[in-house]
Amino acid sequence: MALTIISLIKQVPLPSEMRMGDDGLMDRTKAKSIINIDCRFGLEAGLQLKKKYPDARMIVCSMGPPSFETALRTALSMGYDEAYLLSDRKLGGSDTYATGLAISTMLKHLGFSKDSKEPFIIFAGRQTSDGDTAHVPSQVAENLGIPQATFVERIEADDNGNIVAKRIIEGGYQQLQLPMPCAISLTPTGVPPRKPTLVDAIKARNASITVFGIDDIGLGTEKIGLSGSPTIVAKVMNIVSERPPVVMSEGQTEKELVDGLIANLGKEVSVAAKKVETEKKVSEIPDFPFADPRGAAKGILTWAEVTNGKVARSSLELLTPARKLADQLGNDTKISTVLIGKDVEPLAQTLFEHGADEVIVVRDDRLEEYLVLPFSDIIAQLIKDRNPEIVLFAATTAGRELAPRIGVKTGSGVTADCTGLEIGEYVNKKEKIIIKPILHSRRPTYGESKLATILGFVYPQISTARAGTFEIPVKEEGRKGILSEFTPKYREEDFRVNILKTVRGEGGLQNLFDADVIVSGGRGATGDGLALIQQLADALKEKGVKAEWACSRVVVDEGISEYARQIGQTGKTVRPKLYIAVGISGAIQHIAGIKESGKIIAIDHNPKASVFHHSDFGIVGEYSDIVPELIDRVKNGFVFGMEIAKS
């Protein structure tokens, strides 16, 4: 079998050097860059697969300015044979939809499509640090018409030419069997990427790299670049902190430091979360006519993800912004929720009681477990049939791959990981019109230091909402709605991916959203595998406190904890009354997931750790000294002022 292994990589700015231009787009001209971390794991996965297929052709591809050749040469030095760069000024400002289209067009130009006679596999990183959408791998796969697996930790090839992938899902993992060709996006928890030898690095310096422009690959300008992308960045605002300065404990011993913490906790300290700066430039709205671009599109559609026989919490959360948007749109705008699976009708009542006006049921025994190919096809058919103006997904493992594939099918842009959704207007100065109503999708970006407002001009407008950001609507017992059925046209090729195993246990993971206290460990608390972190949470539970433990991304990346416990921009957003950060440096991506906590206590050995700038109380010390002292205090009745659940 003449297999071709293709790796897609991106060169990204160092987080410390991220800069933004006046147009709200990333300014890469002066930033030092590296290969995106997740992409490195994709490169390594390709090299690992080559062990089974030693004659495989190894290709690495990228899209970007000429400076991206540096990243491609690194890939060549690691063991890849050919390198291709799509570089054209007309691609500048492309959103993920346009990027996925451009990359897939380059791959088709190179001879790769679902009808290719020889098998191929595409590897990519889960997401990039400068965008964090996780959309492009899915969009490339959809444009090529091939199956995919996202959030994959490890892969192996079986003896029948299939790929077996282990991927992370909420609360556990899943094993999928995919035929080739297929696309795989890797998490940074797989086989660590190798370092090239000096000989290979020198050899790569002189290797040739093929550079394409859009004319070379037959790509027009209609759907690329800033003008052709279906979404734009309309506004970017700074996110500023309103938490008061941290109150540090003083003392020489762990006992004195904990005594100081207890004393400080007893004092009245006002706490406020981060918020977007309120200073706004006063500008007059021009006297342009209003234009409603929706045509016949009307209504809001959401997808209800089903896990363990229940509607996922994140899908219920979606109904909160959906109701707000429906109220803002007025004109009797309805919320329809699609429910796909086997024997799922009884779940419709839960959706009615939480705000859905209509539940559209799609029944099929083959859909008992979520599969991206049939689910994306079903929802795309439903969108064509119902013509909604807005479609919302939760930004779960499934939602992050489902939404972008549907976006390609409908020609819509997709805004990822939104923390705010509302209806507004857009002043189009070029055409001298005011577009209204239009969905304003707000998402943190540039390391969570900015809040970008994204607008989509192709209907439906599609957005994913960060799990844990919105409250679940208040349940209205007995509320009724319209129960409908939808019968899609199935394609047998949509069922070519097999689920070999699904392991999903909620346990304490669901309790992260309901906990009053979360004890979270970072790299600085991994000396014992987070044992002390878990012991502190357990001690609080034994006293009747609703407590759970969690971790930062680096702990998951190092394989110490499962992804389902990760807090932060690429994990969960939580709102406990008290968040205890132990050995967590304070990367802004982690702070994004805890900024709405009532109080934050930080414990770190480094007095200059940035986590203290985002905390209410702090202790400088070794976690191995401080946490055992806290555990003893809890066992003796100290519960951080929390209410104790009645037995």
Regions found by a protein language model. Give the residues of each.
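N-terminal glycine-rich FAD/FM-binding segment characteristic of electron-transfer flavoproteins
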Residues: 1-647
